[in-house]
Design a protein with these regions (language model features):
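Residue(s) in the substrate-gating loop at a strand-loop-helix junction
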Residues: 44
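Active-site helix of classical SDR
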Residues: 24, 60
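A short helix-coil junction within the Rossmann-fold of NAD(P)-dependent oxidoreductases
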Residues: 26-35
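Active-site loop-to-helix junction immediately N-terminal to the catalytic Tyr of the SDR YXXXK motif
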Residues: 4, 50-58, 70
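Active-site-adjacent segment of SDR/Rossmann-fold oxidoreductases
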Residues: 49, 70-79
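Substrate-binding pocket helix/loop in short-chain dehydrogenase/reductase
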Residues: 1, 5-10
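C-terminal helical subdomain
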Residues: 77-79, 83-84, 91, 100-140
């Protein structure tokens, strides 16, 4: 955090926390009115742990976890809010952190989607408030 410019830290918080809150404000009224729907908020392994050099990102994803857990308690029966740790995916961010060769051992975004979509389509109100991860995708 000492080396991170304030505007970079602010941008991470603005996107990952404030952006999420703004999207929720748009969709929740209609969902609550019908008492139906599942909200899946993308978190991260770093939303459930910490690591040096990524304190702003960790802080933002811990906020996603907390916001989602609180929202789950506020929703009416028939709805759910879950925080999803998508697992380790071969993305540009991962390549920057791990290097291209080590990152290549993890699924691409396309491979992830093929595994995640069937899982996510089964998320229901019984999962409300539970932190989730995609089965078969490494999370650490």
């Amino acid at each position: 955090v000492l080396e991170v410019p304030a505007d970079h830290f602010d941008r991470v918080i603005d996107v990952n926390v404030k952006g999420l809150a703004n999207i929720l404000r748009c969709f929740l009224p209609a969902m609550v009115k019908t008492k139906k729907g599942v909200i899946v908020n993308f978190s991260s392994g770093w939303g459930r742990s910490t690591s040096p050099e990524v304190s702003g990102y960790c802080a933002s994803k811990h906020a996603v976890e907390g916001l989602t857990a609180s929202l789950a308690q506020e929703l009416p029966d028939g709805m759910a809010a879950v925080a999803l740790n998508p697992g380790i995916i071969n993305t540009e961010m991962l390549q920057d952190c791990f290097g291209k060769e080590p990152a290549s051992h993890y699924p691409s975004a396309e491979e992830w989607a093929k595994r995640a979509v069937p899982f996510l389509l089964q998320v229901s109100p019984r999962d409300n408030g539970h932190p989730l991860a995609v089965p078969g995708i490494p999370t650490d």
